[in-house]
Amino acid sequence: MQLISASEGDTPCCHRPPPPALLKGIEEFNQHAYFECHETLEELWNQERVGRRRHQQSPHRSSLASGCDNLYKGILQVGVGCYHLLRRNYHGATVKLQSGADYLEPFAPVCMKVQVAHLIADARLLRAELVALGPDHFTEVDLALLPQVRLAGSTQEE
């Protein structure tokens, strides 16, 4: 089965503006406040899942039942991977960076103005560097490789 990127209209939620909680979580992520980012995005993720479940049970549901809960979960998990790296947990860092990137794939290249493709690439680059260094030397990684979440149309855009 081939996934269609969000820019091709596969995920209707991607066309919505980013909710304030997502913007707050992104700000926390970019400030390396990964614990706070986790709390913010986990609440948003749970709200989206509950709302989608309620919507799917409604007899009047529409095709808009597709939510962005896994977008939030993907960003959250990349942040958790960074948190583990900063806490010197090799296994946690490599596993969460990979799973976060995997959750984000269906939303690339851009969803809710988040430059998802860039975040995936940055997370995978950091993970590859960690793996190359190995569990005995991963703490030598250049922390400049910590991903940043970029928004399309913002001044942080390259």
Task: Please name every model-derived segment.
Residues 17, 22, 29-30, 85:
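Hydrophobic/aromatic side-chain positions at a characteristic register within alpha-helices
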Residues 77-84, 121-140:
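Alpha-helical linker/edge segments of TPR/alpha-solenoid repeat scaffolds
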Residues 133-158:
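A hydrophobic membrane-anchoring alpha-helix module
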